[in-house]
């Protein structure tokens, strides 16, 4: 029976050193040499690692592999944004590259689909299949760098920032998230500053408390409502951890974090006549008064079948100005890649839904039960 090869992209530095010493009977520094080839030079062929002796190269060829997701489709936006469908087995996840001057941000997925049911997000409507492995998370970054070009001649980084804001809820994949983040920060990995790696969560308090004890990166929270009643309606996770539980966990995290400089980024998607009234703005201002933050308003990005609409520019402007009257720093996110469905909330991929959510949504639609209202569909 043929033994499956070990994918070296599944190891952070500590894990790779252990694998080399315990499984390959090699010195730990050899693991670090290989890491540098993989992440600094984008090499996936052991034969190209010319400072590794032939015996070790043969051992690696026999027992190991370096396999990242492959691009099955690429779409290019007029604004320079690129959306890649990346193959992870027989399914696809979506990864988005957003260039902006000297800054180049990669939006990375953490799950195939999403286990949560946020009503305004197209990813949620696809259902959920599984968590991504470490190699499939960091492999998106590795593959994107290859696609863009490592630009060795100029010395410029092809990717300066990573945001865990793609498909899925990162904190429901803690086992693979933490080593993935370690590789992003590691000098022998992608060597990113902890302030340039951002994890966004919808409110998985247990996961955020684990992050507090294990990793320091920038944090963004998907809040999207100023009270529990409304948040539970559009984000069912609020029934498990309510707003006060969530914010208490956020305060614990930023108190222990250097990456956040004492503040969290609050993400608030604006849904026309749902959560964008001036009373909502004032309620949000009051809610956040004990949690140091900056607020990022996200005008809703439509997708087929959604019951929601983007607010008018005047409503967005009034909402922002109301918050600013309370001395908050408030930005409105510039929509990027919406012409290729690469904007916030539009990622769908190709998901084999294990929750049966997509089948239930289709049945409800055919029975005329949606009718433009917020639907309440539970996974089975």
Swiss-Prot record:
Binding residues for [4Fe-4S] cluster: 114, 118, 121
Protein name per its UniProtKB record: Dual-specificity RNA methyltransferase RlmN
Coiled-coil stretches noted in the UniProt entry, renumbered to this chain: none
Cited PROSITE patterns: RADICAL_SAM
Reactions catalysed: adenosine(2503) in 23S rRNA + 2 reduced [2Fe-2S]-[ferredoxin] + 2 S-adenosyl-L-methionine = 2-methyladenosine(2503) in 23S rRNA + 5'-deoxyadenosine + L-methionine + 2 oxidized [2Fe-2S]-[ferredoxin] + S-adenosyl-L-homocysteine; adenosine(37) in tRNA + 2 reduced [2Fe-2S]-[ferredoxin] + 2 S-adenosyl-L-methionine = 2-methyladenosine(37) in tRNA + 5'-deoxyadenosine + L-methionine + 2 oxidized [2Fe-2S]-[ferredoxin] + S-adenosyl-L-homocysteine
Binding site for S-adenosyl-L-methionine: 168-169, 200, 222-224, 301
Source species, domain of life: Bacteria
GO molecular function terms attached to this record: 4 iron, 4 sulfur cluster binding; metal ion binding; rRNA (adenine(2503)-C2-)-methyltransferase activity; rRNA binding; tRNA (adenine(37)-C2)-methyltransferase activity; tRNA binding
Keywords: 4Fe-4S, Cytoplasm, Disulfide bond, Iron, Iron-sulfur, Metal-binding, Methyltransferase, rRNA processing, S-adenosyl-L-methionine, Transferase, tRNA processing
Uppermost EC category: transferase
Stretches that traverse the bilayer: none
Family per record: Belongs to the radical SAM superfamily. RlmN family.
Compartments (UniProt record): Cytoplasm
Other remarks on this protein: Reaction proceeds by a ping-pong mechanism involving intermediate methylation of a conserved cysteine residue.
């Amino acid at each position: 029976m043929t033994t499956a090869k070990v994918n070296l992209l599944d190891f952070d530095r500590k894990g790779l050193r252990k694998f080399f010493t315990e499984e390959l009977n090699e010195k730990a520094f050899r693991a670090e040499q290989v890491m540098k080839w993989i992440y600094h030079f984008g090499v996936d062929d052991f034969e190209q690692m010319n400072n590794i002796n032939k015996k070790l190269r043969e051992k690696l060829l026999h027992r190991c592999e370096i396999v990242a997701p492959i691009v099955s489709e690429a779409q290019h936006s007029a604004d320079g944004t690129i959306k890649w469908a990346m193959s992870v087995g027989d399914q696809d996840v979506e990864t988005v590259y957003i260039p902006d001057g000297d800054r180049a941000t990669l939006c990375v997925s953490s799950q195939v689909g999403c286990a949560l049911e946020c009503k305004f997000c197209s990813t949620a409507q696809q259902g959920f299949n599984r968590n991504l492995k470490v190699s499939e998370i960091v492999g998106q970054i590795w593959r994107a760098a290859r696609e863009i070009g490592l630009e060795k001649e100029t010395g410029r980084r092809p990717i300066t920032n990573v945001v865990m804001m793609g498909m899925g809820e990162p904190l429901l994949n803690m086992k693979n998230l933490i080593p993935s983040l370690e590789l992003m920060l590691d000098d022998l990995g992608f060597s990113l500053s902890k302030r340039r790696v951002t994890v966004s969560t919808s409110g998985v308090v247990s996961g955020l408390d684990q992050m507090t004890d294990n990793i320091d990166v920038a944090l963004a929270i998907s809040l999207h409502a100023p009270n529990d009643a409304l948040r539970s309606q559009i984000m069912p996770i609020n029934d498990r951890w309510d707003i006060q539980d969530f914010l208490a966990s956020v305060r614990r995290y930023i108190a222990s974090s250097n990456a956040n400089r004492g503040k969290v980024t609050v993400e608030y998607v604006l849904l026309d006549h749902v959560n964008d009234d001036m009373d909502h703005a004032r309620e949000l201002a009051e809610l956040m008064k004990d949690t140091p933050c900056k607020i990022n308003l996200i005008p809703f990005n439509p997708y087929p079948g959604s019951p929601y609409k983007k607010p008018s520019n005047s409503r967005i402007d009034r909402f922002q100005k109301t918050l600013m009257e309370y001395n908050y720093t408030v930005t409105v996110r510039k929509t990027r890649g919406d012409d290729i469905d690469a904007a916030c909330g539009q990622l769908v991929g190709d998901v084999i839904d294990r929750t049966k959510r997509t089948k239930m949504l289709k049945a409800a639609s055919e029975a005329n039960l949606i009718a433009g209202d917020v639907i309440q569909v539970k996974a089975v």
